[in-house]
């Protein structure tokens, strides 16, 4: 591509290009970097000038590749100029001036290439400059880090050297101290040699003292064992007394709970009694109401009886009217039969009238009479129908009255059933009240028994409390005496310990004096060391024994303080027990008063119960009478119902007969109408013939 595009290039052109691009490379954008790299660049130019020419050629080729799209753009612009030559003369002039000034197209191309290459190289140079700046910054940071590490390494060296020096000094000091300690140990050995002989004699004396102390310790141990046994006995006695007190407290709590339960039961019984009184009052009210209702029912029954009598009378009158109606119906039926016979006769006469037209005039008179008779029959039928409608109205009224009476009787029966139920409820409530009163009496008897038992138990508890008080006071006196003895023994043991300590101090002083006077016994050091260790062990054992004795004494003192505290607590508990007993006595007195009140209430309740029994017996008698009256009324009502049913049957029969009569009347009317139509036609024919005869005349 490069050879085809640029064939005439030679060394002169390459020199021109190099002369044109040198100022671009020598632009003062990064003078420091150029200064740093001047010797490197000089060496490179001096070594290989051919490589620089090759680089220039390569740069020209790259610029040519980058300019190719610009040439295409210029060709497109020239095509646009050929199309718009008439509209843009000024642009052509400018192009001509540019072509005239250029003279040679290769020079213009080179200028364009130089401009484009300068832009590309400038951008590449800027990128390289930024990369160099970043690399310089990283190098400087690395140099700073290296300097810091070197400083840290130097400081570590100095610290290590100082530590080594200090360790050497410490080792020297330790060596000196060890030498001094060795010398001190040698001196101690020398002094120990002098003290060993004196220790032998002192050990013998100390053994004697230790044996004496052992005998004294054994005696003290025996005394301590005796005191421990006495203390155990006292503790057992205290436990027994505490158990007794707990048992008494439990009994007291049980008694208090029982008393509270009895109080609650008394309250509940009183509330139940109040409820029963209210129930009795309500029952008395119900009884009075039932009496009033019975009076009202008796009055209503009387009224019903009067109404029944009235209705019976009305029914008798209605039966009479029904008999009259039956008679009238029979008469109407007879008249109907006669009218039927007359109709048959009229039909026969009509047939004869047809056969005998000459006898029409005579038949007209008979027809008029028959018509009059028919009108009379129609009037009679109308009256019969009106009477039948009246009878129907009466029957409907009677049925309504019958239904009303049935409703009244049903309501009365419901009221009677309700009264029976109320009476049964009252009887059940009275029986329940009786059973509850009997239960209350049983409970009161139980309460009396419990109160007597409580009084007995309270008296027993008082006796037991007095005995426990006496025994506790004895135990307290014994514990006081034993504590005083223990305190005296403790004082004696403390004095003995002080004496032994003083003797030990004197012996130690004498041992020091003997150790200063005797320095010639070096050969017996080993034996003396053994003896000294043995004596040390014995002394340690004696010290441990003394410490145990002191600890036991402290423990005894603490036990004495505890026993004092227990004594105080027992005294407080005794005071509380006495207070609780006083409260129990008060509660017992209050319960006795409440029992007396309950007995009085029971007596009053029994009186009231007897009164209620009498009232209930009276109510039963009244209810029996009311039941008998109700049964009588029920029997009367049943009789009335049967009579009503018979009347209803009769009314139904009358209705059926009336319906049959209506049907027959309608048939008669239809027959009469059928007879009237041909008669009227014949009359019209006769009238027409008469008119014709008159016209002919």
UniProtKB/Swiss-Prot annotation:
The organelle targeting sequence, given as a residue range: 1-41, 42-79
Keywords noted in UniProt: Chloroplast, Coiled coil, DNA-binding, Membrane, Nucleus, Plastid, Starch biosynthesis, Thylakoid, Transit peptide, Transmembrane, Transmembrane helix
UniProt-listed GO biological process terms: starch biosynthetic process
Membrane protein topology class: Single-pass membrane protein
Compositional bias annotation for Polar residues: 616-627
Biased amino acid composition, Basic and acidic residues: 604-615
Keyword Transit peptide: yes
Keyword Chloroplast: yes
A GO CC term attached to the entry: chloroplast thylakoid membrane
Chief subcellular location: plastid
Places the protein is found: Plastid, Chloroplast; Plastid, Chloroplast thylakoid membrane; Plastid, Chloroplast stroma, Chloroplast nucleoid; Nucleus
Gene Ontology MF terms: DNA binding
Residues in compartment: Stromal: 128-697
Post-translational modification: Phosphorylated in vitro by human casein kinase II.
Region feature Disordered, mapped onto this chain: 81-100, 599-629
Ranges in coiled-coil conformation: 203-671
Record text on subunit structure and interactions: Interacts with MAF1. Interacts with PTST2; the interaction is essential for the initiation of starch granules biosynthesis in leaf chloroplasts, for the correct location of the process in the stromal spaces between the thylakoid membranes, and for the association of PTST2 with the thylakoid membranes.
Description of its domains: The C-terminal part (439-697) is necessary for DNA-binding.
Role summary: Required for the initiation of starch granules biosynthesis in leaf chloroplasts. Anchored to the thylakoid membranes with its C-terminus facing into the stroma where it is essential for localizing PTST2 and SS4 to the stromal spaces between the thylakoid membranes in order to begin starch granule formation. Associated with leaf chloroplastic nucleoids in vivo. Binds to various chloroplastic double-stranded DNA fragments without particular sequence specificity in vitro.
Name of the protein in question: MAR-binding filament-like protein 1
Gene: MFP1
């Amino acid at each position: 591509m490069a050879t085809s595009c640029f064939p005439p290039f030679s060394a002169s052109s390459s020199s021109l290009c190099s002369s044109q691009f040198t100022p671009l490379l020598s632009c003062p954008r990064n003078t420091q970097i150029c200064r740093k790299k001047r010797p490197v660049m000089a060496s490179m130019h001096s070594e290989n000038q051919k490589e620089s020419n090759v680089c220039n050629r390569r740069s020209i080729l790259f610029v040519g590749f980058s300019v190719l799209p610009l040439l295409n753009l210029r060709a497109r612009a020239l095509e646009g100029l050929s199309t718009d030559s008439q509209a843009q003369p000024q642009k052509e002039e400018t192009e001509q001036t540019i072509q005239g000034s250029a003279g040679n197209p290769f020079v213009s191309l080179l200028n364009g290439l130089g401009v484009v290459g300068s832009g590309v190289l400038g951008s590449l140079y800027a990128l390289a400059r930024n990369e160099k700046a970043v690399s310089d910054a990283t190098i400087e940071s690395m140099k700073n880090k290296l300097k810091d590490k070197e400083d840290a390494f130097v400081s570590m060296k100095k610290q290590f050297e100082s530590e080594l020096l200090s360790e050497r000094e410490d080792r020297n000091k330790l060596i000196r101290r060890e030498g001094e300690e060795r010398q001190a140990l040698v001196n101690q050995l020398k002094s120990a040699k002098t003290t060993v002989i004196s220790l032998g004699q002192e050990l013998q004396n100390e053994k004697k003292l230790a044996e004496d102390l052992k005998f004294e310790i054994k005696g003290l141990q025996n005394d301590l064992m005796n005191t421990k046994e006495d203390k155990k006995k006292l503790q057992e006695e205290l436990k027994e007394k505490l158990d007794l007190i707990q048992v008494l407290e439990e009994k007291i709590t049980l008694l208090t709970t029982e008393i509270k339960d009895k109080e609650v039961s008394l309250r509940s019984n009183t509330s139940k009694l109040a409820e029963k009184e209210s129930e009795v009052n309500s029952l008395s009210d119900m009884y009075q109401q039932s009496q009033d209702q019975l009076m009202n029912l008796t009055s209503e029954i009387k009224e019903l009886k009067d109404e029944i009598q009235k209705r019976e009378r009305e029914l008798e009158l209605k039966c009479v009217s029904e008999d009259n109606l039956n008679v009238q119906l029979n008469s109407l039926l007879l008249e109907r039969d006669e009218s039927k016979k007359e109709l048959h006769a009229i039909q026969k006469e009509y047939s004869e009238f047809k056969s005998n037209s000459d006898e029409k005039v005579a038949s007209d008179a008979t027809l008029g009479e028959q018509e009059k008779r028919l009108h009379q029959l129609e009037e009679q039928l109308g009256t019969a129908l009106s009477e039948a409608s009246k009878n129907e109205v009466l029957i409907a009224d009677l049925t309504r009255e019958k239904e009303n009476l049935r409703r009244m009787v049903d309501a009365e029966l419901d009221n009677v059933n309700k009264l029976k139920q109320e009476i049964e409820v009252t009887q059940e409530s009275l029986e329940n009240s009786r059973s509850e009163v009997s239960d209350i009496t049983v409970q009161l008897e139980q309460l009396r028994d419990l109160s007597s038992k409580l009084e007995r138990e309270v008296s027993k508890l008082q006796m037991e409390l007095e005995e426990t008080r006496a025994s506790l006071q004895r135990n307290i006196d014994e514990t006081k005496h034993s504590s005083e003895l223990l305190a005296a023994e403790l004082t004696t043991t403390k004095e003995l310990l002080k004496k032994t300590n003083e003797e030990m101090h004197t012996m130690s002083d004498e041992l020091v004096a003997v150790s200063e006077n005797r320095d010639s016994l070096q050969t017996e050091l080993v034996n003396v060391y053994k003896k000294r260790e043995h004596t040390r062990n014995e002394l340690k054992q004696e010290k441990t024994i003394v410490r145990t004795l002191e600890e036991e004494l402290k423990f005894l003192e603490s036990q004495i303080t505890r026993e004092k505290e227990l004594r105080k607590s027992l005294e407080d508990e005794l005071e509380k027990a006495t207070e609780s007993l006083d409260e129990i006595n008060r509660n017992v007195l209050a319960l006795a008063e409440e029992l007396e009140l309950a007995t009085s209430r029971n007596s009053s309740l029994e009186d009231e119960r007897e009164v209620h029994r009498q009232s209930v017996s009276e109510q039963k008698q009244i209810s029996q009478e009311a039941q008998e009256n109700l049964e009588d009324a029920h029997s009367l009502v049943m009789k009335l119902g049967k009579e009503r049913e018979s009347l209803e049957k009769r009314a139904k029969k009358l209705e059926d007969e009336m319906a049959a009569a209506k049907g027959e009347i309608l048939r008669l009317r239809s027959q009469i109408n059928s007879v009237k139509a041909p008669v009227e036609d014949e009359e019209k024919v006769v009238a027409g013939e008469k008119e014709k005869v008159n016209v002919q005349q």
